[in-house]
């Protein structure tokens, strides 16, 4: 959890926002997936948001569902994902690592055991996409017991009650949703959510990172200009993996070319 705090403090000092890429662990295979993650970090990623392949990803659009299918085709298991996380943490001791996942994967292990394992491999945060805040108590309590930040989604239509709950229960960062619906770069991010950012600040919520539909540098700059701490980009990155699936070196080069201007857009 402290890794987020020190990251946001450093970025503030440098007058920068955070650029956070999302990829699915094990897509398109374990070895290439680890190279992809190294490349994202070398190109300027400030933190990582990682998915564990799951058979029924509700909040994901087709691009990220395909990533999950590729990881499954490569035989990637949750146990191997945790081995990968341990390797990533060993190699990159300071970068915040977040998991974006579904409740079934947490239940399969047992809630407490799952968060204990997260702590052991050096995961900083977990967002359970299909658990609404009013049902989140067992998850967030286990998370805090194991020094893992529970992350909550703030939808564009959040009312005051929800904003207060998010501020009160969330740690690490707040996942600010650009718009309703499923993930995907085809649907561009909506207008900057200034009023939500202001409210979250007022209630002392964890710093907001805006996600969903972030696929161009101007969409990274807009939320930061509106007061958000940064932006998360997933589908646009996963699409690059898909496009170069048979050319691993080209894929890494293309990822670098995509991430560098996205990170540059966080600098005021």
From Swiss-Prot:
Pfam families: Trp_syntA
Record-annotated active site: 49 (proton acceptor), 60 (proton acceptor)
Catalytic activity: (1S,2R)-1-C-(indol-3-yl)glycerol 3-phosphate + L-serine = D-glyceraldehyde 3-phosphate + L-tryptophan + H2O
Keyword set, alphabetical order: Amino-acid biosynthesis, Aromatic amino acid biosynthesis, Lyase, Tryptophan biosynthesis
SUPFAM superfamilies assigned to the protein according to its UniProt record, in alphabetical order: Ribulose-phoshate binding barrel
GO molecular function: tryptophan synthase activity
Pathway: Amino-acid biosynthesis; L-tryptophan biosynthesis; L-tryptophan from chorismate: step 5/5
Domain of life of the organism encoding this protein: Bacteria
Gene3D superfamilies hit by this protein: Aldolase class I (3.20.20.70)
EC number: 4.2.1.20
Listed InterPro entries: Aldolase_TIM, RibuloseP-bd_barrel, Trp_synthase_alpha_AS, Trp_synthase_suA
Quaternary structure and partners: Tetramer of two alpha and two beta chains.
Family: Belongs to the TrpA family.
Functional description taken from the UniProt entry: The alpha subunit is responsible for the aldol cleavage of indoleglycerol phosphate to indole and glyceraldehyde 3-phosphate.
Name used for this protein in its record: Tryptophan synthase alpha chain
Organism per entry: Escherichia coli O139:H28 (strain E24377A / ETEC)
Gene for this chain: trpA
């Amino acid at each position: 959890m402290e890794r987020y705090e020190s990251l946001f403090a450093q970025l503030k000092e440098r007058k920068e926002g955070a650029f956070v890429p999302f990829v699915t662990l094990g897509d398109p295979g374990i070895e290439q997936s680890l190279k992809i993650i190294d490349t994202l970090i070398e190109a300027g990623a400030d933190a990582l948001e990682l998915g564990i392949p799951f058979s029924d990803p509700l909040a994901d659009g087709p691009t990220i569902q395909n990533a999950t299918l590729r990881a499954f085709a490569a035989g990637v298991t949750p146990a191997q994902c945790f081995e990968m996380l341990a390797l990533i943490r060993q190699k990159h001791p300071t970068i915040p690592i977040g998991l974006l996942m579904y409740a079934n994967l947490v239940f399969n292990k047992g809630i407490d055991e799952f968060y204990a394992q997260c702590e052991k491999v050096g995961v900083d945060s977990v967002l359970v996409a299909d658990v609404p805040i009013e049902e989140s108590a067992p998850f967030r309590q286990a998370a805090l017991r194991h020094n893992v930040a529970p992350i909550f989604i703030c939808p564009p239509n959040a009312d005051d009650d929800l904003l207060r709950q998010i501020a009160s229960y969330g740690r690490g960062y707040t996942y600010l949703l650009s718009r309703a619906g499923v993930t995907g770069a085809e649907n561009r991010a909506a207008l900057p959510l200034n009023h939500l950012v202001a409210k979250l600040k007022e209630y002392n919520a964890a710093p907001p990172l805006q996600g969903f539909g972030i696929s161009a540098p101007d969409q990274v700059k807009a939320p930061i200009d509106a007061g958000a701490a940064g932006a998360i980009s997933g589908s646009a990155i996963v699409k690059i993996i898909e496009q170069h699936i048979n050319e691993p070196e080209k894929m890494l080069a293309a990822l670098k070319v995509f991430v560098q201007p996205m990170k540059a857009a966080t600098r005021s």
